Amino acid sequence: MRTHVAASSVSVLLLALVGLSSCDRPRAIDDARLRSADGDTANWLMYGRTYDDHRFSPLSQINEQTVAKLGLVWSRELGTTRGLEATPLVENGVIYTTGSWSVVYAIDAQTADVRWMYDPAVPRARAYFICCDVVNRGAALYRGKVYVGTLDGRLIALDAQSGTPVWSAATVDTTKPYAITGYPRIAKGMVLIGNAGAEFGVRGYISAYDAESGKMVWRAYTVPGDPSLGFESKAMEQAAKTWNGEWWTVGGGGTVWEGIVYDPALDLLYFGTGNATAWYRTLRGNGEGDNLYAAAILAVHASNGELAWYFQTAPGDNWDYDATQPLMQADLAIGGRQRKVIMQASKNGFFYVLDRETGEFISGAPFVSGITWASGLDPKTGRPIESPTAFAGLQPIIVSPDPGGAHNWNPMAFNPATGLVYLPAKVGTQALHAPDSQWKYDPNRHNIGSDARYEGPLKAKLRSLPPPTGELLAWDPVKQSAAWRAKYPVVEGGGVLTTAGNLVFQGRADGILAAYRATDGQRLWEFNAGTGIMAPPVTYLVNGAQFVSVMVGWGGPDGAYNAPERGKVKPGYGRILTFALGGTATLSVPAFGHTEPPTPAIVMNASPETIHEGGLLYGAQCAHCHGADAVAGPLPDLRYATKAVHEQFETIVLGGARASLGMPSFKDLVSVDQVRAIQAYILSRAGEAAKPPSK
């Protein structure tokens, strides 16, 4: 790991850069301190800073008048080229954050020195069973411990001073394709954690563990299991009535992979659930039923996990419209009275405002244009008014938004002074959904049920549609309308921070970190980080001076499927950057990737039919990690594979020769002849790229 720290004569930095290393041990982070986190302006103790998840800081040294003087103080490389999505936590001048492969770091906020690092040694072959890169969205702090969920399903408690493991709990059945990429949530002496894996075929649930001992307190499932074995609760018994067929043999889905929040006053936990398995309702059963509680927002009692209420955003989901996007609590004046609400900008393109006590639908509206799956929401119930063209049984359709959504996991922020919610929005994303009528559950592969070999006319139509766009959106949740939109030249924007300085901070895929005026969206400052940014910034005090830190590192599903943004998105070496007023450090960005077009490393005689077949197989088996059309982001671009790699191609793909690097064996998925067809396709793509452009 490399560090770059600036020497500065600016007085505010001198104040920040003395004396911290010998500070007293931090004040205990207990339940009372978490409940009063809003008044603790110096620190960032939780994922969204406070239990309401506003990501609003009362700090204002950095404001619309002074932000032009904001500069880099230090950067710390983290030794990865994979995605970085974590929200850093800050307590008493120490940054606690997570990186690729669930690695945890404790970093001195003034010097960038790594106080300790903990690597949970996740088996690299596990990468195949992870939907969207080997990412982690952050840790939790409580009573002298740091908690992290790992990609292989463990929940680990570390000593905050040393990084030494205190306890570890297996939260999943490791024989099944579960994973954890989300952050833990602390509530009432418990650590709450969910999991991912619905694309492969698992049953979703959320678990509560005793923060001191690591023993499980309760577990609440989100979709019903095998009825012949009985139901764990009345909620599961009722949910089973909305399913048909033998859904439990595939797991059912509905995983809680993100977005757990807690209201201490109501003693309720809120979380969203993911898609059902398979994606398409006609493959899950007869195409009927709401399939509870997949693609829904749930509230459960914190003491026992019992269901309090639910609201389903995509009944009978057919489009991968998870409801796992960030949830945010607020008390808003609506209709002449104060309402306790919970809000979500959903994947499906609608912004929801619900009563968080009862789950009552208050309001909802589209926050992006071009939605085709639904014409609107029922004004009383909030149930979507599904478009006739959004479901055609087993026939292919084009629908907007795409499975990446109009908004995904990237955190949004709420500023109480403006009354606005700020979020990264994607406009005009489209997807071709082609259900595979021959699909059968296979525990060794993706089980979304999509026909990756579809070659019909809709494929050409999809390619002819206008490309999507990205924007930072300021949304009024009371009026359910946009206050302003700040367009940017890429589709993907990172998470958001807002402050009392009338500022909104956000990074984006092209590596730009920008500050906007919160009231009107005017861009006031920007910094080129050299690498795409997905994570949200945080802000805090070090000896009275305000700092801003952000994780920088491109990856996730868009690292592979960002075809509309090729040439704009910047993969690179992951790092954490820290800024302050008067910072003068410079950023050295090592070269990453290839600057010259690829050339085929070997000659392989293959017919056009074989190459075409290889392209279909590549799309089904390889594009998930190595990129659509054999054009990769942070992972190896196979068009540049060397002669040595091609000579070992079969050994790597079928023999698992690089399993320790995250490339598992595909021997149960493809034959030798199919591997050769994939190889021929990759070489063909390298040859196409090497050709001079036609005049």
What residues fall within each predicted segment?
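Electrostatic cytochrome c docking/interface patches
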Residues: D31-A32, F592-L617, A689-K695
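Extracytoplasmic beta-rich repeat domains
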Residues: R76-T87, M117-A140, S168-Y183, Y221-G259, ...
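C-terminal capping alpha-helices of c-type cytochrome domains
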Residues: G149, K667-K695
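Repeat-blade elements of multi-bladed beta-propeller folds
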Residues: W44-G48, G83-V103, Y128-R154, A179-R203, ...
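Blade/loop signatures of beta-propeller domains
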Residues: R25-L72, P227-M236, R383-P388, A460-L462, ...
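His/Cys-centered metal/cofactor-coordination and adjacent catalytic loops
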Residues: S588-T610, A623-A641
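Short loop/turn segments that connect beta-strands within beta-propeller blades
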Residues: D108-T111, A121, D159-S162, A211-S213, ...
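Gly/Gly-Pro-rich "capping" loops immediately C-terminal to redox-active cysteine motifs
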Residues: G615, G627-F666
